[in-house]
């Protein structure tokens, strides 16, 4: 009886693994009906075409049609000594509307589109060593695949080729690769190591290539790379370190957005020409530094400016300081420049500032904002979702405030306008809910402000008041004998040394700012 039991075990083991040598289209002749659902390991030598791929998909849990499951259990597939050739039956059909699209190999030595997509039973896969291209969605959704070595002969990896291979642990890009498609490795959550072969001539890390990864901590980009595409490393939750190539010219939109552990960056190289919106949004970077030879950007105290310091481009969200005085040369604050600033509590905006762009301070931890600027234009969502913001003091005339500029600022209770020229308000600039908003305006201008506010409407709901209690540009001024003047500006924001006729903006030694009207 023991002998019979041992024989059964051996038979079962034999039925679960197999090695075959075949001609193209002949795999079905060497795999029995029973083996199609019991084999867990298979090695193929010889040539295979679309007909063979169709059977392999069935053995690995997926039928010819999209998302149709089978009872196949194949987990290990070795094609290292096989060759994929064109021809044979369709191995996959993608049903989209009334026009299904069929796929079969049309070239030799190519992992064609959708060839192994969705094979959730596969854990290891060895590819033919002579493969030259891996096309779109070739392995997408192989959610249990832990090991797949890309052959040295591969030159192109297509869009979403390995997307959602959520258990893949390492990615090694061969030296022959010159193109990585959109989202090629998107959602490979378990990848801890990405390497590029020495001598690789890859010029661009494409859009979303390594996005949505929760395990990768560090990456060194090859020297050949000049562009980092949009969302290339978006939502890399564990990324702490990256090395930029010396010839890098551009960093795309949201390239490193929501990389919360990214605190330090290498110096931006002299070649860098363009950093797009949200490139480092919602990171913890503490300082930006730039090569002194860069012609486009410069930095001061870890803050990134354009080369002339006319535009403030990026404020490091992880910077520890709670206050900031922006240089007088700055006339524009870029989109998302201060977004998610974690520690900044108060800011004084300079007199020469003319533009605060979209979402410039969104989700920052500001509690107060003071601006000395006249004719300032504030774009939509500029200060939205500043959940701790309580006070905004416009000490110069405001030209316009865009839609939802202070949306969802739940604690905002005080806004002061000294300008007698009423701003052009956008829709729902303010959205008071829990706290009543008090809008202070110059004496005698309550009705004019109310008219403009109500016309849009600029305030959502009725939980606000417009109060005409600012006289000569000063709200209830009071002076302490120990406080003295440290600086004075005229109505245009120009620094002056003596009293000038008209509105004077005065900075005091206690840090406060008042306004007086000199006749």
Predicted regions, residues:
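Bacterial Sec-dependent N-terminal signal peptides
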Residues: 1-17
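Boundary/junction segments of secreted and surface-exposed precursor proteins
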Residues: 12-31
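Structural signature of tandem-repeat unit edges
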Residues: 17-22, 40-48, 66-91, 96-110, ...
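Terminal processing/anchoring signals of secreted or surface-associated proteins
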Residues: 42, 304, 449, 473-477, ...
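Consensus positions within tandem repeat domains that build extended binding/scaffold surfaces
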Residues: 113-115, 135-138, 158-161, 181-186, ...
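Extracellular/surface-exposed low-complexity segments
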Residues: 436-472
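Residue-level detector of functionally pivotal "anchor" positions at catalytic/ligand-binding pockets or at interdomain
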Residues: 468-495
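C-terminal tail/sorting-segment detector
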Residues: 503-519
């Amino acid at each position: 009886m023991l002998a019979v039991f041992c024989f059964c075990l051996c038979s079962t083991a034999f039925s679960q693994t197999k090695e075959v040598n075949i001609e193209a289209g002949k795999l079905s002749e060497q795999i029995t009906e029973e083996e199609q659902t019991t084999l867990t390991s298979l090695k193929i030598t010889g040539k295979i075409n679309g007909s063979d791929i169709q059977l392999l998909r069935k053995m690995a849990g997926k039928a010819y049609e999209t998302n149709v499951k089978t009872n196949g259990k194949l987990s290990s597939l070795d094609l290292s000594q096989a060759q994929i050739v064109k021809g044979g039956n369709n191995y996959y059909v993608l049903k989209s509307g009334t026009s299904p699209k069929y796929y079969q190999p049309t070239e030799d030595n190519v992992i064609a589109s959708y060839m192994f997509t969705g094979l959730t039973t596969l854990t290891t896969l060895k590819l033919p060593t002579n493969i030259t291209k891996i096309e779109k969605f070739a392995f997408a959704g192989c959610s249990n695949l832990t090991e797949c070595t890309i052959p040295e002969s591969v030159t192109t990896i297509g869009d979403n080729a390995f997307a959602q291979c959520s258990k893949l642990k390492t990615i090694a890009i061969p030296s022959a690769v010159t193109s990585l498609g959109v989202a090629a490795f998107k959602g490979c959550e378990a990848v801890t190591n990405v390497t590029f072969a020495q001598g690789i001539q890859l010029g661009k890390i494409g859009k979303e290539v390594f996005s949505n990864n929760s395990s990768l901590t560090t990456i060194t980009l090859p020297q050949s790379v000049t562009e980092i595409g949009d969302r290339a490393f978006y939502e890399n939750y564990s990324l702490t370190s990256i090395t930029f190539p010396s010839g890098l010219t551009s960093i795309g939109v949201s390239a490193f957005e929501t990389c919360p552990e990214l605190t330090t960056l290498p110096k931006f190289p002299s070649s860098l020409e363009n950093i797009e919106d949200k490139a480092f949004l919602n990171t913890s970077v503490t300082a930006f530094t730039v090569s002194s030879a860069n012609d486009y950007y410069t930095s001061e105290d870890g803050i990134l400016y354009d080369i002339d310091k006319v535009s403030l481009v990026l404020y490091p969200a992880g910077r520890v300081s709670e206050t900031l005085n922006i240089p007088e040369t700055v006339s524009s604050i870029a989109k998302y420049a201060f977004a998610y600033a974690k520690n900044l509590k108060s800011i004084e905006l300079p007199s020469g500032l003319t533009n605060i762009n979209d979402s410039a301070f969104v989700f920052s931890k500001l509690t107060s904002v003071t601006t000395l600027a006249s004719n300032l234009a504030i774009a939509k969502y500029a200060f939205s979702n500043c959940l701790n913001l309580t006070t905004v003091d416009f000490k110069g005339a405001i030209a316009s405030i865009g839609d939802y500029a202070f949306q969802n600022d739940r604690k905002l209770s005080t806004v002061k306008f000294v300008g007698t020229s009423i701003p052009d308000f956008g829709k729902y600039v303010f959205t008071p809910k829990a706290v009543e908003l008090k809008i202070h305006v110059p004496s005698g201008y309550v009705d004019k402000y109310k008219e403009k506010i109500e016309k849009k409407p600029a305030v959502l709901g009725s939980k606000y008041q417009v109060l005409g209690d600012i006289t000569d540009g000063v709200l209830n001024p009071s002076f302490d004998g120990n406080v003295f003047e440290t600086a004075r500006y005229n109505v245009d924001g120009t620094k002056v040394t003596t009293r000038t006729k008209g509105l004077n903006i005065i900075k005091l030694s206690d840090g406060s700012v008042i306004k007086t009207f000199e006749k």
